[in-house]
Amino acid sequence: LVDTTTGEVVSDDSGDLLFDLSTAWWDLHREGAPDLYPLNRRNSTDAWDKWIGSQINVGHAVATHSKDPEKAAAAANGVLVGFDVIDTLLARATRMEASREDGLTMLDGPALSAVIAIGQYLCGDKPTGSDIRLFTTVQSYEYGGRQHYPGGEAPSISFWPALARWFRALEGRSGWVGPEERSALGC
């Protein structure tokens, strides 16, 4: 968030911004704008956000930027297991076959309050802030980040069919990814 009078960055914490925009500034939303933090899904959204932050977002940053090969490898493995978990949960919620469910434990997944709300998207049938948080990291992973994982190349998201379907559905939504972002990513 940038102060337009000074040009200074006021906040760069997307979680705080999303919370503020969805609560305190709700009256300023354009008509038809999605509710990214719906009241009836806040427990689920909060649980997903906590898990995505620690398991996926931080792990991806460490996997792609750590100078310590052991830390990078452990973080990359955590992200890939996280993708297994999300793929399995999305597959089960949308009646797809879960591809790697057999190797997962209850310790691998998010809190139960996150899992009970899952539908086509992480917290039901409409995208929420949790989908945004995961989407940005999956997007970074798919369009270049995976090439920086230990070993030189991690699998494309097509390796996780339900995750790939979720990603492509969001990527194709009107207004979700702008033309400038598409150009920068080479899509």
Model segments located where?
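C-terminal alpha-helical interaction module
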Residues: 2-187
